[in-house]
Amino acid sequence: MKAAVSLALLVAVAGAASAHNIFPNLIVDGTVTGDWEFVRTTANKWSREGLTNVNSESMRCYEEAGRPPSEVKTVKAGSRVGFASQAPIRHIGPVLFYMARVPDGQDVDSWTPSGDVWFKIHQQGPERSESGWTWPTQDQTELFVDIPASVPDGNYLLRIEQIALHDAQYVGGAQFYLACGQINVTGGGSGDPGPKVSFPGAYKPTDPGILLDLHGHPPANYQFPGPAVWQG
């Protein structure tokens, strides 16, 4: 009996872990790059646990303390860049992408993206049907975004964020799975990205896109947290 209970517990734990995500790989020109080669190693590298405190400084890139250095990948403005997850996305919720420009003369890998430096470039939420909401990102292992064509040349952090909303009916129940890739954009334009926000600071735990009951009382429309998407 004890063996059966232990086996059931292990299966349950494994199932929960498999529903969690990390994004260790950039996808550029159709090629999946190496684990953490161009992505800052995240603190949940082994645990796969999501963040639940939107006021934590870990909301920037969820970096692992003392992480090894990552390199910078050159990408073209207007091109499609992606992140690969090490497991299919099981939890329902939106995916958002942000960028932050590294100041000229600063080392990309050691730069801390504090203050109002982040601008949103894409967000993907649910699709409404007669049976309720469906989430196009569910069960996906690769998520893509187009780098804005008019973004100025330079070094940037590209931040992916998937918000799991299965327990979002409680304050602190939403789980944030995120990572930051390090890219150098070439062939860009003279756009002025914005509005810019900070992490932490861009979200509140009671924002309607973070605190909501998708099981008992789902809202008519999903409200994304954070700023408007820059139409660059």
Curated annotation (Swiss-Prot):
Residues 1-19 form the signal peptide. Its main location: secreted. The keyword rRNA-binding does not apply. GO terms for cellular component: extracellular region. It comes from the Eukaryota. Lytic polysaccharide monooxygenase (LPMO) that depolymerizes crystalline and amorphous polysaccharides via the oxidation of scissile alpha- or beta-(1-4)-glycosidic bonds, yielding C1 or C4 oxidation products. Catalysis by LPMOs requires the reduction of the active-site copper from Cu(II) to Cu(I) by a reducing agent and H(2)O(2) or O(2) as a cosubstrate. Gene3D superfamilies: 2.70.50.70. The gene is LPMO9C. Disulfide bonds join C61-C180. The keyword Disulfide bond applies. GO terms for biological process: cellulose catabolic process. This is AA9 family lytic polysaccharide monooxygenase C. InterPro entries: AA9 (IPR049892), AA9_LPMO (IPR005103). Binds 1 copper ion per subunit. Its EC number is 1.14.99.56. GO terms for molecular function: metal ion binding; monooxygenase activity. O2 binds at H166, Q175. Transmembrane segments: none annotated. Cu(2+) binds at H20, H91, Y177. Belongs to the polysaccharide monooxygenase AA9 family. It comes from Malbranchea cinnamomea (Thermophilic fungus).
